[in-house]
């Protein structure tokens, strides 16, 4: 996929770049796999803002994605590669031989007409899903389960993948996209290959309005606020001292730089071999 840069005809197009849609083969989604999305604007059921900087944006339908890939030993044909407004990756429409249709995350080099399958022992090819115990060491995998049967949770965004580094006993060792090395049960499933649309990270929005189309509202710096609105607000000029403003903080008073916030008693801590920030 190539990045399209626009001519600087207007200030908004001067720095804008767009994803190429060369790999997209179908413009209208599969109607049976769509559900409406209820807008929240970042508010919870009491009407209070719980997620800041959300609101507006273009209307969307949610595409139901098969993250579990649990339709074993039933071959499927890739019918189309589609755009999904809800994620950075492309999605692939599968037509199973028994007539069922499902969406999956589209890995790199998956093409219309390819045949893919899920199961305990299927071919080692891009798009096939199987337990980690049957995947060769050194393979690139995506859509990885952390709990058996729950569905993929790791490496699902554009260009993401993890590397199967080792297997020992009941656990496989994975190098995550963040650099973290952790253990996962060998019965957990993963899909062979790397998620496509890797150039997504190089896209420049070019103007504020494009963020608004995506449902992202403006962010105001804490230092630009009043003391009533933020722990870092107030003071004469660009003041950082006094009133709890000496150290950067979150809007709720939590130290923002360097403070470890992970619960030390979390059960999955023992499965992390090396943290993502370890040297």
From Swiss-Prot:
Pfam families: Ribosomal_L2, Ribosomal_L2_C. Residues 232-242 have a biased composition (Gly residues). Residues 259-279 have a biased composition (Basic residues). GO terms for cellular component: large ribosomal subunit. One of its GO terms (biological process) is cytoplasmic translation. Transmembrane segments: none annotated. GO terms for molecular function: rRNA binding; structural constituent of ribosome; transferase activity. SUPFAM superfamilies: Nucleic acid-binding proteins (SSF50249), Translation proteins SH3-like domain (SSF50104). InterPro entries: NA-bd_OB-fold (IPR012340), Rib_uL2_dom2 (IPR014722), Ribosomal_uL2 (IPR002171), Ribosomal_uL2_bac/org-type (IPR005880), Ribosomal_uL2_C (IPR022669), Ribosomal_uL2_dom3 (IPR014726), Ribosomal_uL2_RNA-bd_dom (IPR022666), Translation_prot_SH3-like_sf (IPR008991). Residues 223-279 are annotated as: Disordered. Keywords: Ribonucleoprotein, Ribosomal protein, RNA-binding, rRNA-binding. Part of the 50S ribosomal subunit. Forms a bridge to the 30S subunit in the 70S ribosome. One of the primary rRNA binding proteins. Required for association of the 30S and 50S subunits to form the 70S ribosome, for tRNA binding and peptide bond formation. It has been suggested to have peptidyltransferase activity; this is somewhat controversial. Makes several contacts with the 16S rRNA in the 70S ribosome. Belongs to the universal ribosomal protein uL2 family. This is Large ribosomal subunit protein uL2. It comes from Chlorobaculum tepidum (strain ATCC 49652 / DSM 12025 / NBRC 103806 / TLS). The gene is rplB.
């Amino acid at each position: 996929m190539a990045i399209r840069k626009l001519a600087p005809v207007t200030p908004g197009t001067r720095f804008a770049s767009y994803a190429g849609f060369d790999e997209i083969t179908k413009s209208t989604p599969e109607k049976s796999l769509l559900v409406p999305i209820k807008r929240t604007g970042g508010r919870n059921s009491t009407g209070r803002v719980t997620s800041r900087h959300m609101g507006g944006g273009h209307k969307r339908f949610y595409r139901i994605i098969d993250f579990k890939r649990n339709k074993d030993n039933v071959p499927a044909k890739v019918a189309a590669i589609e755009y999904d407004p809800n994620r950075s990756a492309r999605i692939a429409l599968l037509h199973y031989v028994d007539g069922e249709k499902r969406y999956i995350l589209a890995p790199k080099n998956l093409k219309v007409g390819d045949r893919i399958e899920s199961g305990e022992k299927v071919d080692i090819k891009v798009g096939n899903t199987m337990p980690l115990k049957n995947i060769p060491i050194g393979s690139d995998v995506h859509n990885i389960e952390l709990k058996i049967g729950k569905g993929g949770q790791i490496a699902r965004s554009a260009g993401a993948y993890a590397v199967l580094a080792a297997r020992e006993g009941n656990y496989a060792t994975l190098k995550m996209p963040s650099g973290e090395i952790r253990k996962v049960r060998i019965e957990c499933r993963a899909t062979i290959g790397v998620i496509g649309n890797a150039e997504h990270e190089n896209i420049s929005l070019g103007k504020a309005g494009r963020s608004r189309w995506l449902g992202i509202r403006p962010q105001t710096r804490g230092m630009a606020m009043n003391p009533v609105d933020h722990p870092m607000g107030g003071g004469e000029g660009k003041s950082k001292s006094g009133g709890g403003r000496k150290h950067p903080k979150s809007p709720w008073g939590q130290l923002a730089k360097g403070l470890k916030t992970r619960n030390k008693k979390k059960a999955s801590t023992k499965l992390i071999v090396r943290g993502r920030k370890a040297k």
